[in-house]
């Protein structure tokens, strides 16, 4: 997958209105990326919980348990075999694995997600730096505008 091409814009050449629009766009992108990080962390936590649950299966043959039908409805059940688990590998596909294989799968997923979180965090940091630059340019333009207004006011007073 190719990265989107970054466009370099001379912030000094933009008007205050354009700077405001760019600032709002960058803030929205930061918000979107932050939400992505939260979703990735949520997914990572699910894999961590799954790994821990698989670890808790050892020595549970014949034990009674509750089997979830939905997030709020459970049926009583009994563990017949605790040597194999069904692992959701994505898009509705499940693979039967040994507990250790399932835990390794979860570890790999957590590692992959952590790498993605780091990449997204790097992008957020870059966007924040861009946002700081935009705000600084806007503030300097506002200061310059105020100076010009003050000079014009002084000139008008002197002409009278």
Swiss-Prot record:
Keywords: Chaperone. InterPro entries: PFD_alpha_archaea, Prefoldin, Prefoldin_subunit_alpha. One of its GO terms (cellular component) is cytoplasm. It comes from the Eukaryota. It holds the Pfam family Prefoldin. GO terms for molecular function: unfolded protein binding. GO terms for biological process: protein folding; RNA polymerase I assembly; RNA polymerase II core complex assembly; RNA polymerase III assembly. Binds specifically to cytosolic chaperonin (c-CPN) and transfers target proteins to it. Binds to nascent polypeptide chain and promotes folding in an environment in which there are many competing pathways for nonnative proteins. Heterohexamer of two PFD-alpha type and four PFD-beta type subunits. Belongs to the prefoldin subunit alpha family. This is Probable prefoldin subunit 5. It comes from Dictyostelium discoideum (Social amoeba). The lineage of its organism: Eukaryota, Amoebozoa, Evosea, Eumycetozoa, Dictyostelia. The gene is pfdn5.
């Amino acid at each position: 997958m190719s990265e989107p091409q970054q466009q370099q814009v001379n912030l000094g050449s933009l008007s205050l209105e354009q700077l405001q629009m760019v600032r709002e766009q960058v803030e929205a992108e930061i918000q979107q990326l932050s939400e992505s990080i939260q979703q990735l962390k949520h997914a990572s936590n699910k894999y961590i919980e799954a790994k821990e649950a698989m670890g808790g299966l050892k020595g549970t043959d014949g034990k009674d348990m509750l089997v979830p039908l939905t997030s709020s409805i459970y049926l009583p059940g009994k563990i017949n075999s605790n040597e194999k688990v069904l692992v959701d590998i994505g898009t509705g596909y499940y693979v039967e694995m040994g507990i250790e294989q399932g835990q390794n799968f979860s570890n790999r997923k957590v590692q992959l997600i952590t790498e993605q979180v780091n990449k997204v965090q790097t992008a957020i940091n870059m966007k924040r730096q861009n946002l700081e630059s935009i705000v600084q340019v806007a503030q300097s333009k506002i200061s310059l505008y105020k100076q010009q207004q003050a000079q014009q006011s002084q000139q008008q007073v002197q002409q009278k």
